[in-house]
Amino acid sequence: VGFPVLKGADFLRDDIQQYVKNANWELCMDYHFGGYAKVNKNLIDFMNAFKKTHDIPLDPVYTGKLFFGVFDLIAKDYFREGTTILLIHTGGLQGIAGMNQRIEKKGWRID
């Protein structure tokens, strides 16, 4: 399962299909939060709660959206019971300071 951060990323399906032989994958297009480097309050609140609970910071461009999407799908019983889920944290934490500069005018902050 993949989580594109681009809005309108349907083209990725064809691109990926060129390189895979199996049909055991899919892209979840509902977790881009408006597109690349776009955020909303729900995402920021999730990221801050995740860090508080697990002591793991998430970046707002990639990993925060991935974790939000997977946790949302878990809550919706998307995955079969007993499914092993591996999430790979790809970094990006250096972008938090810049994002905070952009979102503080809305009264938001990534902790």
Model-derived regions: residue spans:
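Active-site-adjacent helical/loop segments in soluble small-molecule enzymes
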Residues: 27-81
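Conserved beta-strand elements of the Class I
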Residues: 84-86
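Glycine-rich phosphate/pyrophosphate-binding loop at beta-loop-alpha junctions
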Residues: 1-25, 29, 33, 88-111
